[in-house]
């Protein structure tokens, strides 16, 4: 088998074929001329450009191209299940399920499947869902084989992810290798059959794709024109198809229409269900690069990834020299070294380095409460908050103590509730809070809780905490380095916050940074300055009308005014005596 790309088989309606000469099936001219560099691993069953892989069974021999058979001759059959393999280009396309454990069953038609991905394809066909997306035009398909057939319809240049050369998958391209002069390439056969042309009379004038209905053609043409007539009424986004708008509106609501047939978990979007189904089957990635062995969930990710052999990481951080496989991973990592916060909240001025952090923050705003209570219409930002709120509507508590029959809303409250057998027999009751105990020693220990903090006899010299009993003091494992990691270099006193340490250091340095604007006094702490400025404010209240002096309270002003009155009376009496003298 030559080292050339093999295009995925085209699934056409089975019609009698005329006898063909016995020779090996030749690929299209453009793909045959595109050869890989020497030493590249051969992949006869897949294309790394489109991401379609048909992985063979390791226990079987490599596929051999059998001669094409004339119509009417019996073809090869599977030796286990008897399935006809004549229409398949390779026997490995038939995966016999005989002898395997079929554990995935369709809930609608009860059909059984060996793998969860087969069940997903089956359900997508029934529900007309299209989880397999083309990496070139973003068109969706229900089956992986349909996506492989669709890739051959693109006429634009496609880059090979291994040798980075470009070629046209549907037309003859320039030879990628300087080989011997080749014969003129035969024109590529038309991919539209006469029967399909009669069934689909409407064709796109740009890409020649046929359609059965005019509405389908109009919807398809928006891909080329970029028209987006469907606008969201809740935000300023617009879409080219109504289904895309319906898909987008689920981001504003709590609707989850896609349900897993295996575990009945629900999802908002079909792509989330597709990723979830891989977890049941163990096939977490369908598309694999044959050079760097990276796996991808979608063919578009395989097309866009920069291929690096042997797991190389060419993108290196300039700060910490950490290497990454993708430039997007490097850009995301570089934000940890800088103050860049490209993800801004549109409701407040806060910014975030990662998108998931922004999404988590937006739920804190009261304007976005997607989780609604079905009884009172109250909204919540988190589903756990809604679940906690719904306990209010229940007629009885969910968790009940089997001993004292006390009910609790949460299981954690029931675990914290320490109920002893025979709880009704508690003769020792506290006169302050009416709490009862079985033993007098327990009541005495409880009564210490009503005492003031100064009455606690035992004090820890490291963290200044006080305790009632010696058992509590022994159980208290004080770690000042953990609780108060900041230590004063002058007196070894520890603090929990840097601001507390900075304020304490002024005791040793004598620094007084807070100065009064009304006088020449200065203070070490801001609260001392605020208390001092109240003195100046009160001085403006009581003013003497004789001399203009100000006082803090009215009693001092009255005492001061009495001195002025006495002096004035004495002066007036002396004037009268002087006037009477001859």
Curated annotation (Swiss-Prot):
Q: Which InterPro entries match?
A: Znf_C2H2_sf, Znf_C2H2_type
GO terms, biological process: regulation of transcription by RNA polymerase II
> Would you name any one GO CC term?
nucleus
GO-annotated molecular function: DNA binding; zinc ion binding
Residue positions where Phosphoserine is found in the record: 281
Q: Which UniProt keywords apply?
A: DNA-binding, Isopeptide bond, Metal-binding, Nucleus, Phosphoprotein, Repeat, Transcription, Transcription regulation, Ubl conjugation, Zinc, Zinc-finger
The identity of this protein, by name, is Zinc finger protein 319
Give the species this sequence originates from. Answer: Homo sapiens
């Amino acid at each position: 088998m030559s080292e050339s790309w093999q295009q995925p088989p085209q699934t056409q309606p089975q019609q009698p074929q005329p006898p063909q000469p016995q020779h090996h099936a030749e690929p299209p001219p453009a793909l045959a001329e595109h050869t890989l560099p020497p030493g590249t691993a051969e992949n006869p069953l897949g294309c790394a450009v489109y991401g379609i892989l048909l992985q063979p069974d390791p226990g079987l021999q490599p596929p051999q191209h059998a001669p094409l058979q004339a119509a009417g001759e019996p073809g090869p059959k599977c030796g286990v299940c008897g399935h006809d393999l004549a229409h398949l280009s390779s026997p490995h396309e038939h995966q016999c399920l005989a002898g395997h454990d079929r554990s995935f069953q369709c809930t609608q038609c009860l059909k059984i499947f060996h793998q969860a991905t087969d069940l997903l394809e089956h359900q997508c066909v029934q529900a007309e869902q299209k989880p397999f997306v083309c990496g070139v035009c973003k068109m969706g398909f229900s089956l992986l084989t349909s996506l492989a057939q669709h890739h051959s319809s693109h006429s634009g240049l496609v880059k090979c992810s291994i040798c980075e050369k470009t070629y046209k998958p549907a037309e003859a391209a320039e030879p990628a290798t300087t080989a011997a002069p080749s014969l003129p390439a035969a024109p590529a056969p038309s991919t539209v059959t006469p029967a399909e042309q009669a069934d689909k009379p409407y064709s796109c004038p740009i890409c020649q794709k046929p359609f059965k209905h005019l509405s389908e053609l109009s919807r398809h043409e928006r891909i080329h024109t970029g028209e987006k007539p469907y606008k969201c009424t809740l935000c300023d986004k617009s879409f080219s198809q109504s289904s895309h708008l319906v898909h987008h509106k689920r981001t504003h609501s709590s609707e989850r229409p896609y349900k897993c047939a295996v575990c009945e978990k629900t999802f908002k979007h079909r792509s989330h269900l597709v990723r979830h189904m891989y977890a049941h089957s163990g096939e977490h990635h369908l598309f694999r690069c044959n050079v760097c062995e990276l796996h991808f969930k979608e063919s578009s990710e395989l097309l866009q990834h920069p291929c690096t052999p042997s797991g190389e990481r060419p993108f290196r951080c300039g700060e910490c020299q950490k290497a990454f496989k993708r430039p997007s991973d490097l850009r995301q990592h570089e934000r940890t070294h800088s103050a860049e916060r490209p993800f801004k909240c549109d409701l407040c001025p806060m910014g975030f380095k990662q998108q998931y952090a922004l999404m988590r923050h937006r739920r804190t705003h009261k304007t976005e409460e997607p989780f609604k209570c079905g009884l009172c219409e109250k909204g919540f930002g988190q589903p756990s908050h809604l679940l906690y709120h719904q306990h209010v509507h229940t007629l009885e508590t969910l968790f009940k103590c089997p001993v004292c029959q006390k009910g609790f809303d949460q299981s954690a409250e029931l675990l914290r509730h320490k109920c002893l057998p025979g709880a009704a027999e508690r003769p020792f009751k506290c006169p302050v809070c009416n709490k009862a105990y079985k033993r007098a020693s327990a009541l005495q220990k409880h009564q210490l809780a009503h005492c003031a903090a100064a009455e606690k006899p035992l004090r820890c010299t490291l963290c200044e905490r006080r305790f009632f009993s010696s058992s509590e003091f022994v159980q208290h494992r004080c770690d000042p380095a953990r609780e108060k990691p900041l230590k004063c270099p002058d007196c070894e006193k520890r603090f929990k916050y840097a601001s507390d340490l900075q304020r304490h250091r002024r005791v040793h340095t004598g620094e007084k940074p807070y100065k009064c604007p009304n006088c020449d006094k200065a203070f070490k702490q801001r609260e001392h300055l605020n208390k001092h400025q109240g003195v100046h404010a009160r001085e403006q209240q009581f003013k003497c009308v004789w001399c203009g002096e100000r006082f803090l309270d009215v009693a001092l002003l009255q005492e001061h005014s009495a001195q002025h009155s006495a002096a004035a009376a004495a002066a007036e009496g002396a004037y009268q005596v002087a006037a009477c003298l001859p």
